[in-house]
């Protein structure tokens, strides 16, 4: 239980800092992580060289940038309690929100398929805080404390959350029946029963 309270305390402190400072700290953490996480760094570099045909230089530059941005993303996630309807518009921009409203207006519910790019947690937060009736499916973490903490952040900005491996199918069906927006992030291995699809 101490881990939960540690995460809550960190989030409380971070969410009371100026946003620009939060990002700067995150970028610094990302640079530090890139240096110390040698095993993960090498594995990531080898993967994109093999799968995407990157050169050594391209792979190193890409993974370094990724690690740095992940640091900022971590800090932004911890900052989520500070997000509200007033400040989210200055932090997240939607190109065509009218398209989503139009789709919801058809009264059939909307399935929104996204991927783990940029800050996917803020995407859900921005949708919910902008008034979209968002239900989302989350993949439980090996340590349930992380899942509980993350779901608390998600619910705090107005999302309805279903966990994979429970009764999420029923939850998704109910969300669609209520004409809600169902958010799915489906760019991960589906496991033993997963289906591989072409990518890039």
Question: Can you say where each PLM-predicted feature lies in the sequence?
Answer:
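Membrane-anchoring hydrophobic helices of lipid-metabolizing enzymes
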Residues: 1-114, 149, 156-158
């Amino acid at each position: 239980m101490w881990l939960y309270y540690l995460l809550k305390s960190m989030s409380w402190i971070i969410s009371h800092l100026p946003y620009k400072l939060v990002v700067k700290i995150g970028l610094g953490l990302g640079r530090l992580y890139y240096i110390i996480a040698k095993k993960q760094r090498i594995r990531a570099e080898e993967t994109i060289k093999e799968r995407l045909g990157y050169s050594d230089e391209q792979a190193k530059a890409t993974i370094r940038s990724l690690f740095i941005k992940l640091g900022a993303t971590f800090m932004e996630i911890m900052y989520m309690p500070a997000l509200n309807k007033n400040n989210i518009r200055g932090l997240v921009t939607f190109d065509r929100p009218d398209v989503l409203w139009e789709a919801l207006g058809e009264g059939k519910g909307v399935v929104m398929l996204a991927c783990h790019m940029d800050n996917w947690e803020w995407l859900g937060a921005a949708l919910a805080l902008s008034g979209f009736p968002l239900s989302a499916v989350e993949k439980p973490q090996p340590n349930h404390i992380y899942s509980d903490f993350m779901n608390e952040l998600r619910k705090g900005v107005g999302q309805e959350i279903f966990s994979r491996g429970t009764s999420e199918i029923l939850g998704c069906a109910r969300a669609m029946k209520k004409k809600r927006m169902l958010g799915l992030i489906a760019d991960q291995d589906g496991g033993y029963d997963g289906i591989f699809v072409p990518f890039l």
